[in-house]
């Protein structure tokens, strides 16, 4: 399920918009994740106390973590599917330490697409959304495969 060169270009063009404000985009993605799927908040001891969107928006720690998440994802996307080493490292921490189920990766993928479309509607049309969805699915599938190797069935 690889992406064509054209699809990767759409993904990377969209990601260029993220890189103009990684922390801001990351914060919005995490807020979307936590408000849309409150159960995901339970995996984050540092953020469990944040109960409202206003509290989340005011949290510098949440913004920093959003920056960390999207910086890592950006590095993976720029590998255009050749991300084995990055995914292996990420899967190890997410399976063994954080215990993040694959389903939650799907939730955050949806949040990323939603935030990109909301913030950049003219630059993130149907073709770009489809390409990003495909790239994020590739990432999730590779994470799931690594989870299996690690014996994590989350």
Swiss-Prot record:
Catalysis: reaction(s): Fe(III)-heme b-[protein] + nitric oxide + H2O = Fe(II)-heme b-[protein] + nitrite + 2 H(+); H2O2 + AH2 = A + 2 H2O
Name of the protein in its database record: Myoglobin
Annotated positions binding nitrite: 65
UniProt xrefs under InterPro entries: Globin (IPR000971), Globin-like_sf (IPR009050), Myoglobin (IPR002335)
The organism's taxonomic lineage, starting at the top: Eukaryota, Metazoa, Chordata, Craniata, Vertebrata
Modification sites for Phosphothreonine: 68
Superkingdom of this protein's organism: Eukaryota
Cell compartment(s), UniProt: Cytoplasm, Sarcoplasm
Top EC category: oxidoreductase
Biological processes, Gene Ontology terms: oxygen transport; removal of superoxide radicals
Keyword Amino-acid biosynthesis in record: no
Quaternary context: Monomeric.
Residue positions where Phosphoserine is found in the record: 4
Single Gene Ontology MF annotation: oxygen carrier activity
């Amino acid at each position: 399920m690889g992406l064509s060169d054209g699809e990767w270009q759409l993904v990377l063009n969209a990601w260029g918009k993220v890189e103009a404000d990684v922390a801001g985009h990351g914060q919005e993605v995490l807020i979307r994740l936590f408000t849309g799927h409150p159960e995901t908040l339970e995996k984050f001891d540092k953020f469990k106390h944040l109960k409202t969107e206003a509290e989340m928006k005011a949290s510098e720690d949440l913004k920093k973590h959003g920056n960390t998440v999207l910086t890592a994802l950006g590095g993976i996307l720029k590998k255009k599917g050749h991300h084995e080493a990055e995914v292996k490292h990420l899967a190890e921490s997410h399976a063994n330490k954080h215990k993040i189920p694959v389903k939650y990766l799907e939730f955050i993928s949806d949040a990323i697409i939603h935030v990109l479309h909301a913030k950049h509607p003219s630059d993130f049309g149907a073709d770009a959304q489809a390409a990003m969805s495909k790239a994020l699915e590739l990432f999730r599938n590779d994470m799931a495969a690594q989870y299996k190797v690690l014996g994590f069935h989350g």
